[in-house]
From Swiss-Prot:
Residues 1-31, 101-112, 188-192 are cytoplasmic. It holds the Pfam family CASP_dom. It comes from the Eukaryota. The keyword Coiled coil does not apply. It comes from Panicum virgatum (Blackwell switchgrass). The keyword Repeat does not apply. Belongs to the Casparian strip membrane proteins (CASP) family. It is found in: Cell membrane. Homodimer and heterodimers. Its main location: membrane. This is Casparian strip membrane protein 2. Glycans are attached at residue 56. Disulfide bonds: none annotated. The chain crosses the membrane at residues 32-52, 80-100, 113-133, 167-187.
Length: 192
């Protein structure tokens, strides 16, 4: 009777190989949840980028010859917001195949570490973009009397509704990225 021996990578043995135990259902469920959360975050970031990127409003002033226009591209914070959401959305789309690999191979450790690292980097970028835009949205709604910055939302109501609404998808994507990081950390911790 021969004794079964597990052979690790780089070792040789004449003993028969023993297959690693099948992945548990919990690891596979976590990987499926990972893919689902990535799709939701893609929807949030692309909706925010499109909503902010297509925002503009023109108001006539006494005559048709003089008009005031509010566009997202007039403010660098909004431009950064659109760029940050576009970069994060692109990353999320590109990370889907790697996330799908985790459904097939739930024990893949290094690829999960890569995802945790880049998820954290994208969370940082998205937080910076959303925070910059949120500060300007607040000024658009409330103004700053001490700096003589007047609120513009009484005049540009459609513009303000769009820029405020675009923040929702971005903040939702931030929460989803936090959940993705915790999910990956949980999957990595289960192996030790």
């Amino acid at each position: 009777m021969t004794k079964d021996v597990v052979v690790e990578h780089g070792e040789s043995s004449k003993a028969p190989l023993v297959a690693a135990p099948a992945a548990s259902g919990v690891g596979r469920a976590a990987s499926v949840a990972d893919v689902f959360l990535r799709f939701l975050a893609i929807v949030g970031t692309i909706a925010s980028a499109i909503s902010m990127g297509t925002t503009n409003e023109t108001l006539p002033f006494f005559t048709q010859f003089i008009q005031f226009e509010a566009k997202y591209s007039d403010l660098p914070s909004f431009t950064f917001f659109v760029a940050a959401n576009a970069v994060v959305c692109t990353y999320l789309v590109l990370s889907i195949p790697l996330s799908i690999v985790h459904i097939v191979r739930p024990r893949a450790r290094y690829s999960r570490l890569v995802l945790v690292f880049f998820d954290a980097a994208m969370l940082t970028l998205l937080t910076a973009g959303a925070s910059a835009a949120a500060a300007i949205v607040y000024l658009a709604h409330k103004g700053n009397v001490r700096a003589n910055w007047f609120a513009i939302c009484q005049q540009f109501d459609s513009f303000c509704e769009r820029i405020s609404g675009s923040l929702i998808g971005s903040f939702a994507a931030m929460v989803l990225l936090i959940m993705l990081i915790f999910l990956s950390a949980f999957a990595l911790a289960r192996r030790h």
